[in-house]
């Protein structure tokens, strides 16, 4: 799973989140640093309104938070979601002695991104792809 800092970089680069069951997220509050939550039809559901998406915390009586604007949540994309977001640019994932290498096709060239964690290698590749699309 990618670190909050990497997820924040993705959001700042323009990656938008449409919450779905199974999605992991963090709450942008210092007292909840490092905590992960999962969107679930049983406990945390996205509710769509004209003003935006609200995450409703259902059946969590010990929780002092009833709902949260999606803008106050930080999506932590999973490895499969990151790979899907790379779309046709994705070439392959390879194991290296120090971790993983993700290869993408970008501007007619193969670009490689390495990290000890496969999810972070995917995220770095996606950041590069997003950066190239807005340049």
Task: Please describe what each predicted stretch is.
Residues 1-31:
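Extreme N-terminal leader/activation tails
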Residues 2, 74, 117-118:
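Short amphipathic alpha-helical segments
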Residues 4, 22, 79, 119-122, ...:
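Functionally constrained cores in energy, signaling, and assembly domains
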Residues 16, 35, 40-112:
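N-terminal segment of the canonical double-stranded RNA-binding domain
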Residues 19, 28, 33, 120, ...:
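Generic alpha-helical propensity signal that fires on short helical segments
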Residues 111-135:
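Ampiphathic alpha-helical segments that act as solvent-exposed interaction surfaces
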């Amino acid at each position: 799973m990618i670190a909050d800092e990497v997820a924040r970089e993705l959001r700042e680069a323009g990656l938008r989140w449409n919450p779905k069951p199974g999605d992991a997220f963090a709450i942008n509050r210092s007292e909840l640093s490092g905590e992960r939550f999962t969107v679930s039809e049983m406990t945390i559901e996205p509710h769509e309104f004209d003003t935006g998406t609200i995450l409703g915390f259902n059946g969590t009586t010990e929780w002092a938070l009833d709902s949260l604007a999606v803008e106050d949540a930080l999506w932590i994309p999973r490895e499969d979601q990151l790979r899907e977001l790379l779309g046709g640019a994705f070439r392959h994932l390879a194991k290296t002695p120090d971790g993983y290498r993700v290869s993408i096709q970008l501007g007619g060239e193969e670009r490689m991104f390495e990290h000890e964690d496969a999810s972070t290698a995917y995220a770095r590749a996606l950041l590069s792809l997003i950066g190239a699309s807005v340049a």
